[in-house]
Amino acid sequence: MALAQQFQLNSITFSLLVFLGFVGVSQLIRIYWRLRYIPGPFWAKFTDVQRVFWVQTQRAHEIHRDAHGKYGDIVRFGPNMVSVADPAWIKTIYPMRPGFPKGEFYRALMPYSRQGGALPAVFTTRDENLHKMLKSPVAPLFSLSNVLTLESHVDATIKVLVEQWDRRFLDSQDSIDLADWLSFFAFDVMGTLTFSKRYGFLEEGKDVGGMINTIFTFLKTAAPMTQVPWFDNIWIKNSFAASFRKSNGSSILQIVGKHTSERLKASKSQDMNGSAMSVTKDRDMLDQFIGLAAKNPDLPPWCVTAWTFSNVAAGSDSTAAVMKKVFHSLLSHPNTLQRLMDELIQAQKTNKNMKETPFPSWRDICDLPYLDACILEGIRLHPPFCLPFERVVPKGGIMIGKTYIPEDTLIGMSPWVINHHKPTFGEDAEDWNPNRWMGPEEEKQKREAAILTFGAGKRICLGKQIAMLELKKIVATLLLTYEFEILDPERYEVENWWFFRQHGIDVRVRRRSDKE
């Protein structure tokens, strides 16, 4: 009797195991079959785990590039994720019209607090209607004409940087980690533009309060989660799980909230009309955000916090990454540095305004062709964000060349892969070569349109004009003010956690006037 019962129990267990095995195998076949005709690494057919491992290596951008080199322009990176390497398809995947919503990838980049939940922003929201609601009021603030009303804030920050270098390094001839100081500059610029108040990184010569490290730690945590966003919902954006750990996104929100609440209190006694078209000179961006929120009562109550968070978290490190690449490349390639110096010195000699002002104005340098070429080459070679910008294929699917991509597939392009596309940028696409931008204007415009650094289509980065203002001004000013000696070009190090972080640009500086 006992033997019969044991046999019956074993039969039930066996049947259950067979059923579960059948379900598991069927699921694997279903996952594999959907995109079976798209080449890619073996494990990408069944799981996203290898995508997490790629991010954890800190060199996912190189792995993605190598995968495209092996499998072609269209590669399966995951069971439901396809990467495209040819810039010719940028307008298809990132159109100006609605229809290609962002994937769950972006939810992992939203800061989270137990009290307020996940905070959407213009960059991270997947909701097309919410994106339009958040973007439309602030878009005029990021136009070049409005950004130039804030140029004096950039000049004030440059002045502090120059004063600190003169005081700290000219007499001692101590080396400078230029990478750190460019980060300090970029953050203090955004602090000044946003709050009319620097964070104090330049004055202190360090990451005051650990703010830069906090943002990087947040991104370091979020980057792997972007590859498995379902796990982010369980482990990060979950109030129960959040109670057992410190949220880095919450720390950044506290910084933003402090500045915002102080300004809101101060603004109650002021007359604010909120018009982006009537911005007065030197009025900072937080003032303008608050004014716009007051003028648009239909906006969500957290909109000022979301706009400000984007400035603080994304508007600094991204620009600093390109600054570092431009300076490292110039200092490592003396011939291109000399050509740029010749152009800047000639402009200074022939431009009365450049002679009479301490720092070059945007008007004085915006059209210098070789400066423009160097900035574009830095933007191309080292985009700050280097994982694919994921989108969801709309109903009916799409054709990429002769390859059909079914609806609901995640599709994306990595800025690193796109910007290093050899058929577009030349066989030397991996190398620093500003001359590629000095050819016919038509060719230059075609290549510029192929750069994905700032995104594309209706979700293109709002802060592009601010970045260009900072880049051209800091490169021109520092090169005209100092002579640089790079100590070890090979010490340059890069970490990729969605945002890049670079170290090891050790230099010595001396005033140009000291030698001349």
Curated annotation (Swiss-Prot):
Glycosylated residues (UniProt): N248, N273
Identify the main location: membrane
Q: Where does the source fall among the domains of life?
A: Eukaryota
Topology in membrane: Single-pass membrane protein
GO terms (BP aspect): terpenoid biosynthetic process
This entry's comment on induction and repression of expression is:
Expression is significantly up-regulated under xenovulene A producing condition.
The residues that the entry says bind heme are C461
The record's family statement is: Belongs to the cytochrome P450 family.
Q: What is this protein called?
A: Cytochrome P450 monooxygenase asR2
Q: What is the lineage of its organism?
A: Eukaryota, Fungi, Dikarya, Ascomycota, Pezizomycotina
